[in-house]
């Protein structure tokens, strides 16, 4: 109240449900299923269930789930395990075996066509940002400015050197894809990605993901997080292609608990919620 806040919002990083790749693929193929939450999870975690009940008991309010990506953190993510049940790192062959045929073919194609993937430096964020804006225009989303990524780089790498990286995929001297990568402990994230409209056939996006997966594993990560997906699975859903791209890696879709609000001023919180609905 001293800071004139009308609510507190949290987004617990606690996995509640998991759907393995075969389950997601079957759900996509089933015309009777239009949302991931309609498919039976392969696992519902006890911790997730307990935290959900505790939040509800303490008066926290779950945020309404809209279609597509919201302003906050995505509730549904796609993750790839980099270790086996005993905790041993997966080999390249094991990682490739978990992928679908299209992914394996595209990785091989990129290599055959001479796509090279390298790690960049801070100055290369400008090159990443150039095609990131091209991606934003093509895919109809509002991109962030270059200073945002430079600030992220400075802050994260000040905490721990090499926490944030930028990767560049090139073909015959042309930049065809670029990504940012973050690792904290044993969890690595594909943070932001970009690709050019030209030369999409050389499969730079597959090549750059393959490099990041292996680098994450070699750095000691046990999870490679491809981050957000939406839960829409209908054939005409505009985000279905994103899920199909990520599910091709193998891995699993996970649902976190979502974002929750604790109103401090019920009136102002209600007014804010109404504003968001009409925006």
Task: Describe the residue ranges of each PLM region.
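Aromatic (often tryptophan-rich) hydrophobic motifs at membrane interfaces
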Residues: 152-271
